[in-house]
Regions:
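Conserved N-terminal segment of EGF-like repeats
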Residues: 1-5
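Active-site neighborhoods and metal-handling regions in enzymes and metal-associated proteins
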Residues: 6-10, 18-295
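Short cysteine-rich clusters marking metal-coordination/redox-active sites
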Residues: 14
Length: 295
């Protein structure tokens, strides 16, 4: 059944911290989720829906997260190494009171993932990866502030890029916009996934299946897994107000198949050597749609 935890009395204070009586606040919310669960939909445990205080905490974290990517955008250029990007992100985050969430996460050695051209995700910064004119790169960073996590990534084009690479980046961004437009409370994740998948595949590109978005807030990766195809796991999960997750499709110019580096165990590349792009935003579902938290 729907895990709604301890249920307050109808006249007791609501579990969300609003100060309102439960019957005037989240009583109907809990009842609606329970009905949806009984109908066969997936619903998150109550503890994964964020309270107003949680959202404010995530927003403070996200302000650093957005700021650091703005900083990267101002300085990234041909001739820069990915290690220099990593140092920039570490310095900015720490100077603003945050902690890079990637650093030492499950053994990951850096503060950011830098994924160039055919690298799908989890490229590890180093001194030998030098940006060249015509490259495309995804910079994916995550931030912790006061126990709250934020996460986003952006694509950067280094100088003049080929028409093919520019189109891949543009379609990837458009797929995220299509996904956002499909986010509505009380609908399943599948409607968002379908919008992303259609945008990508109509353009002749493919969506990576093995990686996707995720819930996030008080932990780096929370349920649900957020896939971007209609057959992905958890697509029957209902998007309810207070749910925080990321939309971050990884889009390949060729086939969706990937391979993981046997050397570092992290770097993911396209199996056929085609280019890949990714954009990531973090949002909270609201009563009438969504609010962007980081981008």
């Amino acid at each position: 059944m729907y895990d709604k935890g301890p249920v307050p009395g109808r006249n007791d204070a609501c579990w969300c911290g609003s100060g309102k009586k439960y019957k005037k606040c989240h009583s109907a919310f809990d009842e609606r989720l329970e009905r949806l669960w009984e109908e066969g939909w997936e619903v998150l445990p109550r503890t994964l829906y964020k309270t107003p205080a949680d959202i404010e905490g995530i927003k403070r974290s996200a302000a650093i997260n957005v700021g650091v990517l703005d900083c990267v955008g101002e300085h990234i250029a041909a001739g820069m190494t990915t290690n220099q990007i990593d140092q920039m992100i570490y310095d900015y985050t720490v100077e603003h009171g945050g902690t890079p969430a990637d650093l030492n996460y499950e053994g990951y050695p850096k503060s950011v993932c830098t994924s160039i051209n055919d690298v799908v995700c989890h490229g590890i910064p180093c001194d030998t990866d030098v940006l060249h004119e015509g490259d495309i790169i995804n910079v994916d960073c995550s931030t912790i502030l006061d126990g709250y996590f934020s996460d986003s990534s952006r694509m950067f084009c280094i100088g003049e890029v080929s028409a093919e690479r520019q189109r891949l980046v543009d379609v990837t961004r458009a797929s995220v916009e299509a996904g956002l437009a499909a986010v509505k409370p009380w609908l399943p994740l599948s409607v968002m996934a379908e919008a992303v998948q259609k945008t990508v595949e109509d353009a002749g590109f493919s969506v990576v299946r093995e990686y996707g978005g995720h819930g996030i807030g008080k932990e780096f990766h929370e349920d649900p897994f957020v896939g971007f195809t209609t057959e992905a796991p958890d697509v029957d999960t209902i998007m309810a107000p207070g749910m925080v997750f990321t939309i971050e499709p990884m889009v390949n110019a060729g086939a969706p198949d990937i391979k993981i580096s046997k050397g570092d165990g992290w770097c993911v590349r396209t199996k056929d050597g085609s280019d890949s792009a990714q954009c990531e935003v973090q949002l909270v579902v609201t009563e009438d749609g969504y609010e962007l938290l980081s981008w």
